[in-house]
Amino acid sequence: MNFKRPLILISNDDGYQSVGIRTLASFLSDFAEVVICAPEGARSGYSCAFSASDELRLTQRNNIPNCEVWSCSGTPVDCVKIAFEQILKGHRPDLVLGGINHGDNLSLIHI
């Protein structure tokens, strides 16, 4: 990682392969170091959940050019926590982003 540019950590609840995260990362990688740690697949509705007892898998991916991409078997919260503890190893990101979301963010009040 080249820390002469801003460091941005991205996660989401739609997974590391989602169109939204790829679009956001591709745009930001022109002027920042981008690290992605997102779930292996869609975890909609799990944004505030975390894994208390499950063993988590962390896998490095290469699906987005000019970005360091990791997938995690856990929730979005697990992804950000693991990114801080294992991937960034003490380096503090300048910005942490979530998204771009696929679909609407609706709660029970809207259903």
Model-predicted regions and their roles:
Residues D78, P93-L95, G99-D104:
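Glycine/small-residue-rich loop that forms an oxyanion/phosphate-binding "nest" at active or ligand-binding sites
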Residues I10-Q17, N105:
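Short, glycine-rich nucleotide/cofactor-binding loops
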